[in-house]
Amino acid sequence: MAVAPRLFGGLCFRFRDQNPEVAVEGRLPISHSCVGCRRERTAMATVAANPAAAAAAVAAAAAVTEDREPQHEELPGLDSQWRQIENGESGRERPLRAGESWFLVEKHWYKQWEAYVQGGDQDSSTFPGCINNATLFQDEINWRLKEGLVEGEDYVLLPAAAWHYLVSWYGLEHGQPPIERKVIELPNIQKVEVYPVELLLVRHNDLGKSHTVQFSHTDSIGLVLRTARERFLVEPQEDTRLWAKNSEGSLDRLYDTHITVLDAALETGQLIIMETRKKDGTWPSAQLHVMNNNMSEEDEDFKGQPGICGLTNLGNTCFMNSALQCLSNVPQLTEYFLNNCYLEELNFRNPLGMKGEIAEAYADLVKQAWSGHHRSIVPHVFKNKVGHFASQFLGYQQHDSQELLSFLLDGLHEDLNRVKKKEYVELCDAAGRPDQEVAQEAWQNHKRRNDSVIVDTFHGLFKSTLVCPDCGNVSVTFDPFCYLSVPLPISHKRVLEVFFIPMDPRRKPEQHRLVVPKKGKISDLCVALSKHTGISPERMMVADVFSHRFYKLYQLEEPLSSILDRDDIFVYEVSGRIEAIEGSREDIVVPVYLRERTPARDYNNSYYGLMLFGHPLLVSVPRDRFTWEGLYNVLMYRLSRYVTKPNSDDEDDGDEKEDDEEDKDDVPGPSTGGSLRDPEPEQAGPSSGVTNRCPFLLDNCLGTSQWPPRRRRKQLFTLQTVNSNGTSDRTTSPEEVHAQPYIAIDWEPEMKKRYYDEVEAEGYVKHDCVGYVMKKAPVRLQECIELFTTVETLEKENPWYCPSCKQHQLATKKLDLWMLPEILIIHLKRFSYTKFSREKLDTLVEFPIRDLDFSEFVIQPQNESNPELYKYDLIAVSNHYGGMRDGHYTTFACNKDSGQWHYFDDNSVSPVNENQIESKAAYVLFYQRQDVARRLLSPAGSSGAPASPACSSPPSSEFMDVN
């Protein structure tokens, strides 16, 4: 019976015996992937992720050769890898199925793998190495995921088969557990549950000792109860029940054990108390004071102004609170709910609705907020309903208040739709008919299928005009809208911060703030920097540095949009631009990494790893000095600002010791691919993906001499050829030097501590331009509306099919306002998205509090006898403070009863003056038409909700109702 291959520091002994020159390094080459070694690596990763499975995993690794000689299994071809991962039943295109496992893979590593397999060269230096998910974890003790990870930006999802393929081919970083998540089935959608609910289980008599347990949103309360009983070793004959402690400190009994964690509205971090019935038959909770879910004791006798009520932040739910406060201060809609008009219009059978649950939950919230008995309320039930019907709002991540508002208005409309059975309506083009006729027909068709208090209050009508650029065919349609999303005038400039690294080693790096064109190129960045430094743009190279590596080396013609605001951009002064023709210039530009040899341990084997540190360099080396010794001297000169040159006494002291070490280690030269030992760097960060490598001309002029040579001269560091990752985990023949044009400076810890000044190395100076702030002139709201109605050409991704040409055309499109609603919601598009970047526009938009006149924007023939039909007054503003991925939402709103403005910041409410309302944070504006405001103030209008037939008042539409 054969014996499974033993591993030494990750190296198969059987392979090591056949390849003694690689045994020193202690790692397998990429092509070596025998089943025994591969399963051994898998077993080692499993031990770290799940100690309980260690024995089984190791046994599986050994069992491969129990009955036969081990078989060598080569990596499949790159095309085959791509097909197995990206396509087919087992790949990323596989549809989600409830209960199946999917796995998270760090985005940068996956992009590196894509570049590797699409490159077509199995020996490429872009080999991604082991799967490394370190950047996804909050810590490496409990292996908790970071909060706020976004699919497509931070990670990709792979089905189980694809994941196991990648692990079997490339391995998983030592010690890291797989990030396995289940597919759950939610209403109308299946979703990978990246963030399960973490509950804190405690006993009623020992609240200080908790067990943190993860549950799926689809797990039942019965499973939570069974888990708690198991954790606390409850005897089978003992009766138990659960209580949930909410954010206000009150307790809710979990009666129904059949409902899910989602339906019970349990959330991560929530305390679940299990109580056990006492021997006398009573429950301990009978002696506890259980508070009401939404009202504290101090609120019971509180009498305040109706509507002046805060909303508790349940955890990143300020976006929801802001939208709710704005909507709550829409007078006619609030009266509609306070007067129970909605009860007669609830539509429980609408397949597009939510069985009336959203409308009822919102009604309860409005009634509490306008009762005058609460300083603040907890919108716990409402949040649960929203998450139940819109899975994108599940959990407690940041969201957009306008997106929540859009969902809520649509949900309320469908829940309150008076049309119980929607008829089919054929949409017709104008075909030369008068606009008035086509518009009335479009509105009547809309009302045949959509008739609710939301339509009465918020819906208006667009006129859309499309013109074919080839045949001149004109298409006119009229479409309803619920809000206007208006663009902001965007500056064509952007500010980039870069670090300039001069060639003169005496000068420190300089931080610069550059103003460059948004749609410019890398060459524009170099020109802007040249004005500050006096260095010609031809002597600059631009790089994105990430985790001590070159993540990307930019070409001059690449767009600046590929640089994100969070990228660390370094611009290096070199002796001239690199050409692709060998011998075309006298200098060679070499990318250089800094590494430190650090002790590491892998089970019972100790070895030395190499860890990157500091900032990489691009060094110009004269061709006639491009030998290992010449390169060493050039690097000593470039590092001279923070590396101390050894004196003669240091060299004498180190001679004897150096000779001993050389005899012991016999370090091979880079040209033979040797390295003392070079496992994967252990620091966090994705594999580098230098997608546009410049043609560095690393000839064989380095020769085959060893470095450092045997001589009685003290060398501070050794040099090693590496790949773009900064690793040398593959053999490198002299012919491969062109494919690995990177040099690593390897430091021993003692030498680095003695001669390398880390403080000086990290030092830099700020150029005067760093204090520059690009001024942004304010814009008027009317300018945004004008921009909204400007003629635009359709993009290539969204062409229009011309019925005359019978082809898709990039037509011109113009939107005009035809009919305005009672309440006009204006969404300022502050968030800008491109292929490479996302940004928030903090431009100050000046908007009027009163008398916003739309008469110049409405193209429908106007009613001159009633100018109030086109004038609006502001009633609410949703504000957003912060950036793209984080921030805070608040609200300004005018109370319908008192006319006083208030500032709502979650559960805090305070009065404000009108001059405080306008700010750069304004995001969504609510305007009320003046004729509606006047009608609501009249005695007849103040008694109910005039927009609803259920309240015996006709709708205010400019067209007749069609039912």
UniProtKB/Swiss-Prot annotation:
Its EC number is 3.4.19.12. It comes from the Eukaryota. Residues 938-957 have a biased composition (Low complexity). The keyword Protease applies. Residues 649-665 have a biased composition (Acidic residues). The keyword Zinc-finger does not apply. It catalyses: Thiol-dependent hydrolysis of ester, thioester, amide, peptide and isopeptide bonds formed by the C-terminal Gly of ubiquitin (a 76-residue protein attached to proteins as an intracellular targeting signal). GO terms for biological process: protein deubiquitination; proteolysis. Monomer. Associated component of the Polycomb group (PcG) multiprotein PRC1-like complex. Interacts with RANBP9/RANBPM. Interacts with BRCA2. Interacts with CHUK/IKKA. Interacts with NFKBIA. Interacts with SPRY3, RAE1, MYCBP2/PAM, and KCTD6. (Microbial infection) Interacts with papilloma virus protein 16E7. This is Ubiquitin carboxyl-terminal hydrolase 11. The active site is at C318 (nucleophile), H888 (proton acceptor). Belongs to the peptidase C19 family. Its main location: nucleus. GO terms for cellular component: chromosome; cytosol; nucleoplasm; nucleus. Keywords: Acetylation, Chromosome, Cytoplasm, Host-virus interaction, Hydrolase, Nucleus, Phosphoprotein, Protease, Thiol protease, Ubl conjugation pathway. Residues 65-75 have a biased composition (Basic and acidic residues). One of its GO terms (molecular function) is cysteine-type deubiquitinase activity. Protease that can remove conjugated ubiquitin from target proteins and polyubiquitin chains. Inhibits the degradation of target proteins by the proteasome. Cleaves preferentially 'Lys-6' and 'Lys-63'-linked ubiquitin chains. Has lower activity with 'Lys-11' and 'Lys-33'-linked ubiquitin chains, and extremely low activity with 'Lys-27', 'Lys-29' and 'Lys-48'-linked ubiquitin chains (in vitro). Plays a role in the regulation of pathways leading to NF-kappa-B activation. Plays a role in the regulation of DNA repair after double-stranded DNA breaks. Residues 717-731 have a biased composition (Polar residues). The modification N6-acetyllysine is found at K245. Transmembrane segments: none annotated.
